[in-house]
Amino acid sequence: MKLFDYPGIQNTDETLKIAVERAKKGDIKSIVVASSTGYTAKKLLDLLEKEGLDLNVVVVTYHQGFHGEDTISMDKEVEEELKKRGAKVFRGSHALSGVERGISNKLGGYGPVQVIAETLRTFGQGVKVCYEITIMACDAGLIKAKEEVIAIGGTGRGADTAMVIKPANMNTFFNIEAREILCMPRIKKKVKEDDE
């Protein structure tokens, strides 16, 4: 397992290389990648094409309205480009927040799903994202619950975490299994140099 010093976009290229290297073993059929604008997804597709790997690539992006009413983070042109290159693009609500976040935003407090998300964040935002996008892709029928996948997530933009996960659906959430952590940040939150 590779440990990065800090989370963030600066780890994207190495995270993707580590994930693709693991995929070359041949036992993984699908890669699920979080990508808000398409930046990380395009880099992953470039690398897979370079290596001659033909995998089921599922790109999970923010739902419409995440960053403001009726806004989407991934331009339609970028989405179409990803699809033309063979990726499946899924836009949907976060599995580990959804309506529960709306209730908390309006009324305060928290719910059990938010507790799960916060617990996963103790391992890093990217770990939480990997779990979440795997569940979302599984619920959408884009991956199978019985087949291990590589999930790639990050902290903010880019990628800093890659894992092999045995997927599960939302209604069987506790059947999900982290089988391998390929890479992740050692320090979970960005720290200013003068704070160290």
Swiss-Prot record:
Q: Which Pfam families match?
A: PK_C
InterPro entries membership: DUF1867 (IPR015074), Pyrv_Knase_C (IPR015795), Pyrv_Knase_C_sf (IPR036918)
Per the UniProt entry, what species is this protein from, by scientific name?
Answer: Methanocaldococcus jannaschii (strain ATCC 43067 / DSM 2661 / JAL-1 / JCM 10045 / NBRC 100440)
What protein name is recorded for this chain?
A: Uncharacterized protein MJ0504
Lineage, top-rank taxon, reads Archaea
